[in-house]
Amino acid sequence: MFPEQQKEEFVSVWVRDPRIQKEDFWHSYIDYEICIHTNSMCFTMKTSCVRRRYREFVWLRQRLQSNALLVQLPELPSKNLFFNMNNRQHVDQRRQGLEDFLRKVLQNALLLSDSSLHLFLQSHLNSEDIEACVSGQTKYSVEEAIHKFALMNRRFPEEEEEGKKDADVEYDSESSSSGLGHSSDDSSSHGCKTSPALQES
């Protein structure tokens, strides 16, 4: 027997590094970095990072629910009318709620087989493009979309932290999971695959 070959499968997910993005002159929003580290066979890529905003999480939950009607999906953090993107406590509570949501989703084998989830986690595609890709209306497959994004973004935070611990590039400071950074729109990820599934809210 080779014990090293019998390692239990795992999927780890972090939601971190909230950043304020400018949508236009009057409007801004916060997006979050979603990082995946896994040895699961259902994922094409074993590490990835991508940026998503709250509205995209709402779309994902509706999409997953429409494809798994009998599954009780976890709740997202509620949309607070008094949410203040400059309030660190508000931002971190939402970040933690989004992370808890994804952790519970990734524990469900049926949800884990949905290609929409994998494209959400490991590609730069928006909701409309995810729907088109999953339904076979694009020139690229789910796996190709993920690989393409992986080639564009070869970075994973744990690797950075290992090599740059002294450079303050970790889970603390201003752009950490509980901090709040500012930047222009940017996405980073590395891919994963499986099967299909709705529509933007």
From Swiss-Prot:
Region (Disordered): 155-201
Written domain comment of the UniProt record: The PX domain mediates interaction with membranes enriched in phosphatidylinositol 3-phosphate.
UniProt xrefs under Gene3D superfamilies: Phox-like domain
A GO CC term attached to the entry: centrosome
Taxonomy of the source species: Eukaryota, Metazoa, Chordata, Craniata, Vertebrata
A GO BP entry: bone resorption
Single GO term (MF): 1-phosphatidylinositol binding
Source species of the chain: Mus musculus
Tissue occurrence: Expressed in femur, calvariae and teeth.
Annotated compartments: Cytoplasm; Endosome membrane; Cytoplasm, Cytoskeleton, Microtubule organizing center, Centrosome
Required for interaction with ATP6V1D: annotated span: 8-125
Stated name of the protein: Sorting nexin-10
Segments passing through the bilayer: none
Membrane topology field: Peripheral membrane protein
Binding residues for a 1,2-diacyl-sn-glycero-3-phospho-(1D-myo-inositol-3-phosphate): 53, 79, 94
Residues annotated as domain PX: 10-127
Family matches, as SMART domains: PX
